[in-house]
Amino acid sequence: MLRAIPGVGDAILLKLVHAFGAPDAVLSAPQSALEEIGCRPPLVEAIRRGPAPDAIRELDKESEQLQRRKVTVLTYLDAQYPAPLRTIPDPPPLLYVQGSLLETDRHAVAIVGTRKVSAAGRIVAEELARDLAKMGFTIVSGLARGVDAAAH
């Protein structure tokens, strides 16, 4: 829900959640508390307003699509969130998981690229992902269109 607020990107989202403990606590935080952690007035106002109705509808549609594709969303706060990712300087606040996370997923590779992939590029991404998966690598992707989607 916080990502639907203008001005809240990944880094700010993590900062807010670290400060307040949970997304709901951020949305109900007093103005003074938001200012204390360094939020500027326009961001404080945006957080206090919450996401716009259009943004909420988009999130609902995205949630339905993820359910249809059997994708689980893990947040940085979830116990299943991979421990190695917690140690990097700018960890993703959300992970989209198809299938299940296993101990063997420590050997993972991300396949990313353009959203406007050519037919040849799509084939290369698909074959690369398939070959790496056969070798025991977990394929990681942001689920964006193009190369990312082809990798899955």
Write out the residue ranges for each language-model feature.
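Short, positively charged patches
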Residues: 1-134
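Phosphate/pyrophosphate-binding betaalpha-module
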Residues: 129-152
